Design a protein with these regions (language model features):
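Short hydrophobic core segments
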Residues: 26-28, 133, 148-158, 192-193, ...
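Glycine-rich dinucleotide-binding loop and its adjacent helix/turn
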Residues: 5-12, 65, 157-212, 216, ...
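Flexible, glycine-rich terminal cap/loop adjacent to redox cofactors
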Residues: 28-33, 39-54, 59, 66, ...
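Beta1/beta-strand and adjacent pyrophosphate-binding region of the FAD-binding site
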Residues: 16-33, 186-196
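FAD-site-proximal beta/loop scaffold in flavoenzymes
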Residues: 170-186, 270-346, 432-436, 447
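Glycine-centered short loops/turns at secondary-structure junctions
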Residues: 45, 210-212, 242, 440
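Glycine-rich flavin
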Residues: 2-23, 39-46, 51-186, 219-223, ...
């Protein structure tokens, strides 16, 4: 679906390192983690060979972040046009041309692709080769028919969509987040298996583009890892878009009949569909790496085991990105890859910070979060929850988008340990909270920073101010402020 289709061939560099018997760093995998690690190490002056079996750019460019957000942009535009009458703007006959939508998606990929191309890597000083790399020992790997030696190696092969062994599912030719971009036409009836971020995003997108969508999630609710109130708002939005949500349901079998394909549910229900999208999680791509020969271990789920410095059981081999089992986001892969590259080629001892990795679900409304959620703030937790509903945020009122909130989770000293923001462009309001959580800032620090008005950032600001005001009414603080007022009155009465 792009200018560089899967399976394309591109020129490879020599596998022999210049002026040495071994490469300073061998990078296996050319997605976000591999690209960032390779460029970082080359920037430090190391000799770097990156080996990619298919296309550089990885899932984010070709089948993940870029195409999905382009598709969502088109879908949200259709929804906004249909809803324009609420603002006094009538848009008659909103029609979706799915072929043109997919052309727009391809254009987005084509625009971003040069940044992640082999040419861009070479310009950064990285040697690039196309092929399958397999570890053959603690410091050697086979690339095609050649043996390559390395002083350090970094594994960055990512993860792939998992397809559950549901009887009959394979017969229905299921789509995944990797393959859905090859759809020849808009599905009339789409079944989405999985109610996580990917399922919710793509389910809403196809519903807004005109498909009849049914989402089936085994957990009791969608977005089970997020704040329950946030999940409820997204669920309500999906239902308003015409999506049928079946939470707490499991598909036991797929059969075919006169009406099309049919998903049989454990509760006795059925869902008839034409196409099925599987979005139930991802599995690491490690089967072809030869990990056992290099002394690299994996956990019970198959993810490469790393320490806090992203070092594997082989101290000369590092790993970054989705195959480590850390939160599977492009930004995580990039930050961790840079860290691992510095540790590998410079001997640094930097450690990862998993607690403050931001996450965003790009539905309408968006859900942006970091750290712990309100569900962790039980009576014995010592945590405090401060929430501003967007009915109190003037920008949300002006835009008619008050179905949302900004929520801070604070420890006993008022330090930010988590946050959830729901609303338009919620992810854009999150960075200041991530910074606060990472550096131990307190609600009073956020309250003291002037926020532009009117913005959705007002939600976080008001939540932090709310906490400060609560603190001012604590008995100890109240005694201090009363004493200061008394002193001030006496001074003014002189």
């Amino acid at each position: 679906m792009s200018a560089s289709p899967a399976g394309s061939v591109w020129d490879s560099d020599e596998l022999a390192p210049p002026g040495s018997a071994v490469w300073d760093l061998l990078v296996i995998g050319g997605g976000t983690a591999g690209i960032v690690a390779a460029k970082t190490a080359a920037g430090f002056g190391a000799s770097v060979l990156l080996v990619e079996r298919d296309r550089t750019g990885g899932d984010c460019l070709w089948t993940g972040c870029v195409p999905s957000k382009a598709l969502l942009t088109a879908a949200h535009a259709a929804a906004d046009a249909r809803a324009a009458s609420r603002y006094g703007v009538d848009v008659a006959g909103v029609e979706v041309d799915f072929t043109r939508v997919m052309t727009y998606v391809r254009q987005a990929i084509t625009t971003v692709q040069p940044t992640d191309s082999p040419a861009a890597l070479r310009e950064a000083g990285v040697h690039v080769a196309q092929g399958v790399a397999r570890l053959t020992g603690p410091r050697t790997a086979q690339v095609g028919t050649d043996l390559v030696g390395f002083a350090q190696a970094l594994l960055a092969t990512g993860a792939a969509p998992a397809v559950p062994p549901i009887p009959g599912l394979a017969d229905a030719s299921p789509w995944t987040s990797e393959t859905i971009w090859s759809l020849p036409a808009r599905p009339t009836r789409l079944l989405v298996l999985g109610g996580g971020s990917i399922g919710c995003e793509l389910g809403q997108a196809f519903a807004r583009l005109g498909s009849a969508v049914t989402m089936v999630e085994a957990e009791p609710r969608l977005l089970s890892r997020e704040d329950a109130d946030a999940a409820a708002l997204v669920t309500a939005a999906l239902i308003a878009d015409g999506v049928t949500v079946r939470a707490g349901a499991a598909v036991t079998a797929i059969t075919s009949g006169l009406m099309g394909w049919c998903a049989e549910l454990a509760d006795g229900g059925e869902v008839v569909f034409d196409e099925v999208l599987v979005a139930v999680g991802r599995s690491p791509r490690t089967t072809e790496l030869g990990l056992d020969r290099a002394g690299v271990t994996v956990n019970e789920r198959g993810f490469v085991q790393v320490n806090s410095r992203l070092q594997t059981a082989n101290p000369r081999i590092w790993a970054a990105g989705d195959l480590t089992g850390h939160p599977q986001f492009t930004h995580t892969a990039g930050v961790h890859a840079s860290l691992a590259a510095g540790n590998a080629v410079l001997g640094l001892r930097r450690t990862v910070d998993v607690a403050t990795i931001p996450r965003v679900t790009f539905t309408q409304p968006e859900v942006a979060a970091v750290g712990v959620s309100a569900e962790h703030a039980g009576p014995q937790s010592g945590l405090t929850v401060r929430t501003t509903q967007h009915t109190e945020v003037d920008r949300a009122i002006a835009e008619g988008a008050v179905a949302g909130f900004s929520r801070l989770i604070l420890d006993g000293k008022g330090r930010v340990v988590g946050a959830t923001i729901v609303g338009p462009r919620a992810g854009e309001s999150l960075p200041e909270v991530v910074l606060a959580a990472r550096h131990g800032l307190r609600a009073r620090n956020l309250a003291a920073a002037t926020h532009a008005y009117p913005t959705y950032g007002d939600g976080v600001w008001k939540a932090s101010i709310d906490h400060v005001q609560h603190q001012l009414h604590q008995p100890g603080v109240h005694r201090v402020t009363s004493a200061l007022r008394t002193v001030r009155r006496r001074w003014l009465a002189r």
